[in-house]
Regions:
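Modules that initiate DNA replication and primer synthesis
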Residues: 1-102, 109-168, 173, 182-187
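Short, amphipathic alpha-helical interaction segments positioned at domain boundaries
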Residues: 169-204
């Protein structure tokens, strides 16, 4: 989620591939091949070659995802230093008791420090966060995020953006949120290789 280059390297080796996250995975792979200078057809060929290698079927338009990746202006994030301070930890502990709420809040805070705009607004995919944090997506969207909102950690903005598979089943959902805690990338603790669990064990 934070280090997208590391994430892509894992996917290319067939690791941590969650079929519920295929839309995001395909998008990141398309960006990866775009940055290698490939054209539309070459990107498509590489993605389907990867899919055949790991027996993965794409239940959506890969070409549409390729267009999205080609239009995206942001390069894949590499090893970005994300710092957590004692003040950050205090903000979380002042609001939450449950382990999963604290981990989700920490993960969203880390993600927002590198992905939020100048107003502290960031788009969050509950499917992608569920895969990263090894939590049930329904628990994140139905229980944990409402608690984060109720206790003034963040606020919900606008409508949800939903992507569907060919059979109309939900593929992924994104919604924008505004963090209501300070977003200052400073502190003693560091997130490395997207390992939120090691970071959580250090700060909580």
């Amino acid at each position: 989620m934070i280090n997208e280059q590391y994430e892509v390297a894992q996917y290319l080796e067939g690791k941590n591939v969650n079929k519920k996250c295929l839309h995001r995975i395909c998008f990141l792979l398309a960006k990866y091949y775009k940055e290698k200078g490939m054209n539309h057809l070459e990107i498509r060929s590489e993605i389907f070659g990867w899919g055949r290698q790991y027996n993965i079927y794409f239940p959506f338009s890969v070409n549409s995802v390729i267009y999205q990746a080609l239009e995206d202006k942001h390069p894949l994030r590499g090893e970005t230093q994300v710092y957590i301070s004692d003040s950050d930890v205090a903000q979380i502990l002042a609001r939450f008791d449950s382990k999963n709420c604290k981990i989700l809040a920490l993960a969203i805070l880390c993600y927002a420090k590198v992905a939020a705009n100048s107003d502290g607004e960031v788009a969050i995919s509950t499917v992608a966060f569920a895969n990263w944090l090894k939590m049930q997506q329904s628990h994140i969207s139905g229980r944990y995020i409402p608690e984060l909102i109720d206790f003034d950690f963040m606020e919900k903005l606008g409508d949800e953006e939903t992507y569907f598979m060919w059979d109309k089943k939900t593929l992924s959902k994104n919604r924008r949120y505004k963090l209501k805690v300070p977003l200052v990338n400073e502190g003693t603790y560091v997130l490395s290789d997207n390992d939120i669990f090691t970071l959580a064990s250090e700060v909580f």
